[in-house]
A protein has these predicted regions:
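Glycine-rich phosphate-binding loops of nucleotide-dependent enzymes
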Residues: 2-201
Length: 201
């Protein structure tokens, strides 16, 4: 049994047709699994189903042996699942550090040590911690989004097309950072269109 699993999932949006049908995905801690396919193939839908943003007609989602199929997306975050959407979802009018702090909304402890760990993973963020995110490059904004997702100390990190809209050089750098995160024993589930890049990691 894998650490994080979507098992025989079937479902769609509202009363519309099923977008995923009998789909299974699994990933273990310290592993990266990429969901590959062309636009419109349902890759992001699979991820949304595992996060609880899509109602399943059948199938289940399990983390560390616990069935979380009936949990809300917020409760799934409390179970250790973090998500970075394709839109990056950063607050451009706030500083880097303020963006990271927004990721700590579920924490009731002192999270400054976690911010320091994130700065160790993404050194450029320490250098620019007081700078507005709107002034950063696309690759740096993606690092902010990744860092914010790590503020809850997740066991599972889901990334929806993390390299969308960035240059090949920035893409390589982002994948290097994703590999660093994997080495911290996080299970990473990633939607990616670039098969070559996905297979390289």
């Amino acid at each position: 049994m894998a650490f994080f699993e979507g098992i025989k999932m079937t479902g769609g949006y509202g009363k519309g047709p099923d977008i995923i049908n009998d789909c299974s995905v699994d990933v273990n801690r310290g592993e990266i699994v990429s969901i590959l396919g062309p636009n419109g193939a349902g890759k992001s839908t699979v991820m949304k189903a595992m996060l609880g943003l899509l109602n399943l007609k059948s199938g289940s989602v399990v983390i560390n042996g616990k069935d979380i199929s009936k949990l809300s997306p917020q409760d799934r975050v409390r179970e250790g699942i973090s998500f970075v959407p394709q839109t990056k979802n950063v607050f451009v009018g706030m500083s880097v550090e303020e963006n990271l702090e927004m990721g700590a909304y579920l924490r009731d402890d002192n999270y400054q040590n976690i911010i320091e760990e994130i700065y160790d993973l993404f050194p450029i963020l320490r250098e620019k911690k007081d700078q507005l995110v709107g002034e950063l490059s696309g690759g740096q904004r993606q690092q902010v989004a990744l860092g914010r997702a790590l503020m809850i100390k997740p066991t599972v990190l889901m990334l929806d097309e993390p390299t969308a809209g960035v240059s090949p050089i920035v893409m390589d750098e982002l994948f290097d950072h994703i590999i660093k995160v994997k080495r911290t024993n996080v299970a990473i589930l990633m939607v990616e269109q670039n098969a070559k890049q996905a297979l390289n990691i």
